[in-house]
From Swiss-Prot:
Belongs to the RBR family. Ariadne subfamily. It is an enzyme of class 2 (transferase). Keywords: Metal-binding, Repeat, Transferase, Ubl conjugation pathway, Zinc, Zinc-finger. This is Probable E3 ubiquitin-protein ligase ARI15. Zn(2+) 3 binds at residues 128, 133, 154, 156. Zn(2+) 5 binds at residues 208, 211, 229, 231. Zn(2+) 6 binds at residues 236, 239, 246, 252. The lineage of its organism: Eukaryota, Viridiplantae, Streptophyta, Embryophyta, Tracheophyta. It comes from Arabidopsis thaliana. Ubiquitous. It catalyses: [E2 ubiquitin-conjugating enzyme]-S-ubiquitinyl-L-cysteine + [acceptor protein]-L-lysine = [E2 ubiquitin-conjugating enzyme]-L-cysteine + [acceptor protein]-N(6)-ubiquitinyl-L-lysine. Members of the RBR family are atypical E3 ligases. They interact with the E2 conjugating enzyme UBE2L3 and function like HECT-type E3 enzymes: they bind E2s via the first RING-type zinc finger, but require an obligate trans-thiolation step during the ubiquitin transfer, requiring a conserved active site Cys residue in the second RING-type zinc finger. The active site probably forms a thioester intermediate with ubiquitin taken from the active-site cysteine of the E2 before ultimately transferring it to a Lys residue on the substrate. A zinc finger (IBR-type) spans 106-174. The keyword Manganese does not apply.
Length: 452
């Protein structure tokens, strides 16, 4: 037992009989504890502090420097910090730190928290990533889901993913969420910010009917009726006929084709911009839901109402559920872009589910608003609606995780593996291709347009 206490830094105080007790010095800077020391008496002053397990005394300034060095300068954190004396292993505990300054006490508390987190890392302790939140969340994880996020609701109201620490991004995976925020979303925003480029191409070029490469109209010679492509093909930019079949009079034998030949299908093959619009609208709804929750919390704190504690709990849970639902609907837009961009049947079904879910959330929000303004709160009604909306979104999440199984995608097996069929052109694409190879190929799309 004595050996264990010694190794733990809990050995009893043993005063050296040869120690000169006529003067008390700081063991580091050698300053005397009392500035008024006259050399005639033993000085025992509060400025000199030791651990309960040894007699080595040090001034507050030296204690502060020593603890700061151990708190922030060591590579590996240890819960037990020993006495500053090199030959002493007495542990520095709260009994010693509470005699120091408030700043030192705060450093010690952070150090102990860090030590606890490192020691019990298997318990998965993490700080809430919300700005200004100091809550630490302890999550006992039995089995970790490798594919989908684990949503955590902090006491501050922030909802985040336990795996990647991003905001809760159900129903997409952590990798999908990271790609959406860092790559896909920026790409869609760039496409929206550059409408002039597409307009200029539509107004100043015509697709060659031979190779379908855009050919610029000669602005300096607008009377020039025939254009020459890099493939050596010549055609009329009004009716797309060759000089041989155009006619000798110079007039077009057929009405002019649309200037959007070859580009309409390309634009239709990029439906992600509509996902961006839905994403932005969902973000606005999410911000409003968070604002209503914060306003409710502030009103309860500043002006306590006549509502019972149970009523406040029901309203708070309802408002937090709305925030979670709005956040899920927001990230379902990313799911829309990632998983249904080229499967219009699934996209239409997903949009139907999103619209239905949004209507349910809006109706629930109105019910909470009406109950809040009413003189008497009907808890039974709100609890019933909370259960119903929770069940609806549970099945909604399950449906998206399973890949919208209600919509059967046509496919067939070939020697190269399974293929998916494009809804527009029925071309068989490999599952490794997110976009239809035929629709997104400029040559193929222009051939399809000319054949109409």
């Amino acid at each position: 037992m004595e050996k264990l206490m010694t190794e733990s830094g809990l050995k009893p105080v043993v005063i050296d009989s040869n120690q000169d007790l006529s003067r008390v010095y700081c063991g580091i800077c050698s300053n005397i504890g009392d500035d008024d020391y006259d050399g005639d008496a033993v000085v025992v002053d509060g400025d000199l502090i030791s651990t309960p397990f040894c007699s080595h005394k040090f001034c507050k300034a030296c204690w502060s420097k020593y603890l700061k060095k151990n708190f922030f300068s060591v590579e590996k954190n240890h819960t037990a910090i020993s006495c500053p004396d090199r030959d002493c292993r007495a542990a520095v505990g709260p009994e010693t730190v509470e005699k120091l300054t408030v700043r030192d006490q705060a450093m010690y508390e952070l150090y102990i928290l860090k030590s606890y987190r490192e020691k019990y890392l298997g318990w998965k302790l993490k700080l809430c990533p919300a700005r200004g939140c100091n809550y630490v969340i302890e999550f006992h994880l039995a089995s970790e889901d490798e594919e989908h996020s684990l949503n955590i609701v902090c006491l501050c109201g922030h909802i985040f993913c336990w795996r990647c620490m991003l905001e809760s991004h159900r129903p997409v995976t952590c990798n999908n969420a990271s790609d959406w925020l860092s790559r896909d979303l920026e790409k869609l925003i760039e496409e929206v910010d550059k409408p002039s480029t597409v307009s200029w191409i539509d107004a100043n070029t015509k697709p060659c009917p031979h190779c379908f490469i855009p050919v610029e109209i000669d602005g300096e010679r607008p009377w020039a009726q025939f254009l020459t492509c890099v493939c050596s093909g010549r055609f009329c930019w009004k009716c797309f006929r060759s000089p041989e079949t155009h006619g000798t009079s110079g007039s077009c034998l057929a009405p002019a084709r649309s200037s959007n030949v070859g580009f309409n299908h390309w634009n239709r093959a990029k439906p992600g911009i509509s996902c961006l619009d839905l994403w932005n609208a969902s973000q606005v709804n999410l911000v409003n839901a968070k604002y209503e929750l914060e306003a409710f919390e502030e009103s309860i704190i500043k002006k306590p109402s006549d509502l019972k504690e149970q009523d406040v709990k029901v309203l708070r849970e309802g408002l937090m559920l709305i925030v979670q639902c709005r956040q899920f609907l927001k990230w379902s837009c990313a799911y829309d872009y990632i998983h249904t961009e080229y499967d219009m049947a699934k996209r239409e079904y997903l949009r139907f589910l999103q619209q239905n879910a949004s209507g349910i959330v809006h109706s629930f929000s109105q019910s909470i608003k009406e109950e809040t303004e009413a003189k008497e709160l009907t808890c039974g009604k709100l609890l019933s609606e909370t259960t119903n909306i929770g069940n609806f979104f549970y099945h909604f999440i399950k449906t998206l995780r399973e890949g919208l199984p209600e919509v059967q995608a046509e496919s067939y097996d070939n020697y190269g593996g399974p293929y998916w069929l494009c809804d527009r052109c029925t071309y068989g694409n490999s599952w490794f291709q997110r976009a239809c190879k035929m629709c997104c190929d400029p040559t193929a799309s222009k051939m399809d347009e000319l054949s109409d």
